[in-house]
């Protein structure tokens, strides 16, 4: 067995304490070729004899540039040389859209996790990523769910309880630690030149805004943002748990709709969480704050009041004691 470094032991401790992985599991590693995913793959491989995992690897080539395609070819050769079961997915040429690219990557991860019967998908996100995500979403005005979105584990597809678990074993490490680990183990990291392009807001946040905040406001900025995310995560989990109980009282699947009286009597935070969950069942993407608030306003509105149209053409409408979803193709029906 390979001798484990202090970094190996920290990751193994996180896996055990947070129950991220179990012995003997089949794991899919999301592998970009950068320092974080190389560190993740190396650490999991070194822990493999102790945990008896079966490790599979997926690399996604977005075809944004010739450099990225060259990276995919290099990594495929390296993975073959290492004898690791792997696949490389190549996207149709798409415009630079981080949200669209992320959705495509997660679709591929879900597909290959099912193909290889993997119970867990591991990504190389670090505490540095978590801090950036927290600040980025805060600047965009997102709610608690967005601020704590980069957590240790969740379902790969949050709408599908049969999907694999998405786990982030490196979330306790910083980016400089994975950089040093790759240097120590002489891992052939492929530098992603697109990460230096300041035309993209997330890059500017990482390269300019966060260093400025560290220098002038808090040298321990990453630790502070991670601490805030951890505290907020516990509060958000409480709201979600209480909203799940309220959901059983208000949801009318046959309509589909929500009963107004018990929902209106609940605290606003629970109203919003239930409305968010309801709209998430109906819309192609998670609802925005404005879309949730449009539903909340109907809890006190008169009968036949309705929301603006949602994506896809449907809307919410007050019918009797319920706020119901009306599909664009659904015929009108009289409800007193």
Swiss-Prot record:
PANTHER family on file: TRNA(ILE)-LYSIDINE SYNTHASE-RELATED (PTHR43033:SF1)
Reactions catalysed according to its record: cytidine(34) in tRNA(Ile2) + L-lysine + ATP = lysidine(34) in tRNA(Ile2) + AMP + diphosphate + H(+)
InterPro entries listed in its UniProt record: Rossmann-like_a/b/a_fold, TilS/TtcA_N, tRNA_Ile_lys_synt, tRNA_Ile_lys_synt_N
Family named by the database record: Belongs to the tRNA(Ile)-lysidine synthase family.
The enzyme's E.C. designation: 6.3.4.19
Domain comment quoted from the record: The N-terminal region contains the highly conserved SGGXDS motif, predicted to be a P-loop motif involved in ATP binding.
Tagged with keyword NAD: no
Ranges in coiled-coil conformation: none
Keyword Nucleotide-binding found: yes
Job of this protein: Ligates lysine onto the cytidine present at position 34 of the AUA codon-specific tRNA(Ile) that contains the anticodon CAU, in an ATP-dependent manner. Cytidine is converted to lysidine, thus changing the amino acid specificity of the tRNA from methionine to isoleucine.
Enzyme class: ligase
Any single GO BP term: tRNA modification
Transmembrane segments: none
Protein name (record): tRNA(Ile)-lysidine synthase
Organism, scientific name: Synechococcus sp. (strain JA-3-3Ab) (Cyanobacteria bacterium Yellowstone A-Prime)
Primary localization: cytoplasm
Pfam families documented for this protein: ATP_bind_3 (PF01171)
Entry keywords, A to Z: ATP-binding, Cytoplasm, Ligase, Nucleotide-binding, tRNA processing
Binding site for ATP: 32-37
GO molecular function: ATP binding; tRNA(Ile)-lysidine synthase activity
């Amino acid at each position: 067995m390979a001798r484990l470094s202090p970094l190996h032991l920290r990751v193994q401790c996180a896996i055990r304490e947070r129950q991220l992985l179990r012995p003997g599991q089949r794991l899919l590693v999301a592998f970009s070729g950068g320092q974080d995913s190389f560190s993740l793959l190396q650490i999991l491989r070194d822990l493999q004899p102790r945990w008896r995992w079966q490790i599979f690897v997926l690399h996604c080539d977005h075809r944004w540039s010739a450099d990225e395609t060259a990276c995919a070819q290099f990594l495929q050769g390296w993975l073959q040389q290492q004898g690791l079961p792997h696949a490389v997915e190549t996207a149709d040429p798409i415009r630079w859209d981080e949200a669209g690219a992320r959705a495509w990557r997660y679709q591929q991860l879900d597909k290959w996790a099912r193909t290889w019967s993997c119970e867990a998908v591991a990504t190389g996100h670090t505490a540095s990523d978590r801090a950036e995500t927290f600040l980025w979403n805060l600047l965009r005005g997102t709610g608690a769910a967005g601020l704590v979105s980069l957590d240790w584990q969740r379902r790969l597809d949050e709408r599908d309880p049969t999907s694999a678990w998405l786990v982030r074993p490196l979330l306790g490490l910083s980016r400089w630690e994975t950089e040093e680990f790759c240097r120590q183990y002489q891992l052939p990291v492929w530098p992603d030149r697109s990460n230096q392009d300041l035309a993209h807001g997330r890059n500017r946040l990482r390269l300019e805004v966060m260093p400025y905040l560290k220098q002038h406001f808090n040298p321990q900025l990453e630790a502070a943002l991670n601490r805030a995310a951890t505290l907020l995560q516990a509060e958000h989990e409480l709201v979600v748990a209480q909203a799940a109980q309220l959901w059983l009282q208000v949801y009318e699947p046959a309509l589909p709709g929500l009963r107004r009286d018990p929902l209106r009597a609940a605290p606003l935070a629970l109203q919003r969480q239930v409305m968010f969950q309801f709209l998430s069942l109906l819309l192609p993407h998670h609802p925005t704050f404005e879309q949730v608030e449009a539903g909340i306003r109907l809890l006190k509105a008169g009968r036949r009041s309705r929301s603006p149209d949602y994506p896809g053409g449907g809307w919410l409408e007050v019918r009797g004691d319920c706020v119901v979803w009306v599909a664009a193709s659904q015929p009108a029906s009289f409800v007193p």
